[in-house]
Amino acid sequence: MIISFEKLGEKYKIIDLNLNSIKQKIGDSLNIKEIKPTKIICVGLNYIDHAKELNMEIPEYPIIFLKPTSAIIYNEDYIIRPRISKRVDYEVELAIVIGKKCKNIKKDEANDYIMGYTILNDVTARDLQQKDGQWTRAKSFDTFCPIGPRIVKDIDPMNLNIECRVNGEIKQKSNTKNMIFDVYELVEFVASIMTLYPGDIISTGTPPGVGELKAGDVVECEIEGIGILRNYVKDEE
């Protein structure tokens, strides 16, 4: 299906992802459920305004961690609050989708390896994160990685309005220009450590304003030029 996507008078190119050939077709809609990343790399404390909110020093290098691919859900799916957690938070983030295998590349080359950009909600069991002192358990539950609604290529990733709303109320609001490490620096840094494969995701960190999700909530993550990622929240049965 061919679609036309236009917002605020600017036209954007939508990427059609074919995992066999990793083709980029201008104007085709994306079935984001076809993305099969081998890994999801997330970045912590990557917004200047978020660091100020937490009264923390600016990191010298990106702080990275992994989320499992089993946590992925999509637009309009349910986020399930696990029974063992009493506090589950939202975190809206711009996510990079890798288009070509890469290792040890420079930031000036990074754009050649990027398929496009999407939205990721880095859902976190905050109470477990605080108990553990590390992040794996808190960020790895099933349904804790909503992504979507599409992948977009031709936008300026470093000047996008980013926002999270819960039940229509704005909770997070910033711009990607407030990132400490830009998307190209992040690709360079991660690729210096591990090989990146087509479909792999690098999520670029969240702005200030993170907070709790409760059963019955509707959480909407919106990034300029990409769209709205909407999910519903319920408790584990």
Swiss-Prot record:
Presence of keyword Metal-binding: yes
InterPro entries cross-referenced by the UniProt entry: FAH, Fumarylacetoacetase-like_C, Fumarylacetoacetase_C_sf
Gene3D superfamilies: Fumarylacetoacetase-like, C-terminal domain
SUPFAM superfamilies, alphabetized: FAH (SSF56529)
Keyword set, alphabetical order: Metal-binding
Binding site for a divalent metal cation: 91, 93, 122
UniProt-recorded Gene Ontology molecular function terms: catalytic activity; metal ion binding
Top-level taxon of the source organism: Archaea
One Pfam entry name: FAA_hydrolase
Family membership: Belongs to the FAH family.
This protein's name: Uncharacterized protein MJ1656
Organism: Methanocaldococcus jannaschii (strain ATCC 43067 / DSM 2661 / JAL-1 / JCM 10045 / NBRC 100440)
